[in-house]
């Protein structure tokens, strides 16, 4: 079914970038969050769209499934599984330590009676007696000997449906799999000098780290992910894993690659960051005993320092994220001391420092990759601030300490009145320490964090030392400077392109042939077949699929699935604590939010409408999770999307992610879903409308919301492709049998195609109406 594309996007939406992390930490892990990046910094989007983009921090993420690679001979690293994916029978892998272990693995096809076969093992022709009694599964057998002239013995067979095998060197042993899928387990062979065992592989293979052994076992038992089984995934040489290590000194410029017009330069720099905080203190009106606000605000600091004998002019912009709002109220009288709000940064807060200097590294910082930094930690201690009251002793806010720890670096753009500067944004996480802060002559004491009252403590600046490294694409001519393309321009261009593309997509609805659409809706579209209409290379297609998944991850559909997963988890835990059958039935109905309150249902229409509307929000997700043979709204939506992508002349890899995500959210907004119970049909729409009727007469019957909630939990949910109004019209004008009615209620694609091929105007009008709802 074409809706496979949406399920594939939901299961493969794994990409996370630094801005997602910053927004999540800043909003989800604190309360009363104030985000004030200041007038000089803007990092809403990446500065440009070029190449692989920047590396957000210095953390290396090891891939879960690395490959596929072509057959080769090499010494696999210890503690890594080598996952083998042979396609034909014969020798799959062989390896030896040339002392006391010669080990090979042979693959035998299904249904092989006992026979003698000749295999080439370690350069010798060897005759072995083999068999495979399984009618459906392939058989892997290990053959080994302990002396050069010894005979081979057979060990540890693995009967496999996915036809996958794995080997790992670890802790003086060689580990393999044995048993029968889907219940295969690991076994091992002891050997000396195991780390020097060279292995020759005769099939494509993958590399999986040992800490992901559970995932490796899942692949052995159930097969590789669907995305690995397309013709677009091709194996590459193992040399692709090699990394060219360049010895680099600090404060050095290295030419990584060069052509006639462009060159890649690696800049390594020592760096001295000086910064300070700024604050705003606003006194409230009245008699002078109350303050309305004490808050942080961004500030730019310019300074000079010496780097390798060269004087560097730099400036920094310091801002904070995720502040905590405190208050103090000494009483209700006008002469009682009070502070409506004062900000404090602590463990859930972040400090951002945007840094720029006049060195060569920042002159062409437009196209950047491999960005990394190492910085020291700095401790910031607050000073004292005296609240001058008209009469009485003055309260004093004093103390407070936080330590800034480096937590990542990315590109940013700083704007001034005269110039736009591409700079580096350093992100710091915070920890609190002694001394705590307090307000004298009040009960506020022993609080931790750094308040905004006097964060600099009479210091001119705080200082951090460290280094950074980046690779920048610059003109080969050092006298030419790359024009700055800041993110605002890039985003405005993208919005304009999206606007034009939406108009084109909506106009293409008139050009879709209905019979072809039904055929396309029945195809199992994957990501590569969906996007094949765009002119691009295979590499660009892979990158494009990743970009689509990254954008789709933030869609309403993906968010709903995530929320539903959490709800089901909560329901499962409540089931484990339930003591009655009734409570279990109520809790396990995770598709509804009314299940826990179903016992006190009111008979009013308003209450039933509210409950069915709540259930209807989950029906699309239930249908996606339990795929049926019938056609659904997402099949039509995906087919229309594919057709429009193929017909479009304006779609590009840049605009595709937004278009796919919008289509999943906006195509066919007026949806109705149904569940069938014998001769009774229950329907609920996204707009809260609900009704029940009999199949043979289409006469309405009372709507039992309790029964509907139970059916939604236990029965398949079906898209009402042909709605009740259309069915009644069809019965009144053409007459349909009970079986035809059942087929149309189940959205049987064969029956739909028959009506369309017969040019039935009622069915064609309904499908055309659905196509016209596929608008952006």
Swiss-Prot record:
Q: Where is this motif: DGE motif?
A: 308-310
Q: Does the keyword Hydrolase apply?
A: no
Keywords, A to Z, come to: Capsid protein, Coiled coil, Disulfide bond, Hemagglutinin, Host cell membrane, Host cytoplasm, Host cytoskeleton, Host endoplasmic reticulum, Host membrane, Host-virus interaction, Membrane, Outer capsid protein, Viral attachment to host cell, Viral penetration into host cytoplasm, Viral penetration via permeabilization of host membrane, Virion, Virus entry into host cell
Show which residues form the site (Cleavage): 231-232, 241-242, 247-248
Disulfide pairings: 203-216, 318-380
Record InterPro entries? ConA-like_dom_sf, Rota_A_VP4, Rota_VP4_MID, Rota_VP4_MID_sf, VP4_concanavalin-like, VP4_helical
Annotated region (Spike foot) at: 510-776
Q: Where is this motif: YGL motif?
A: 448-450
Q: Which SUPFAM superfamilies match?
A: Concanavalin A-like lectins/glucanases, VP4 membrane interaction domain
Segments carrying the region annotation (Spike body and stalk (antigen domain)) are 248-479
Q: Locate the transmembrane regions by residue number.
A: none
Coiled-coil residues are 484-518
Would you identify the family this protein belongs to, as annotated? Answer: Belongs to the rotavirus VP4 family.
Additional free-text comment from the UniProt record: In group A rotaviruses, VP4 defines the P serotype. Some rotavirus strains are neuraminidase-sensitive and require sialic acid to attach to the cell surface. Some rotavirus strains are integrin-dependent. Some rotavirus strains depend on ganglioside for their entry into the host cell. Hsp70 also seems to be involved in the entry of some strains.
Q: In its UniProt entry, what is this protein called?
A: Outer capsid protein VP4
Question: What is the scientific name of the source organism?
Answer: Rotavirus A (isolate RVA/Pig/Australia/CRW-8/1987/G3P9[7]) (RV-A)
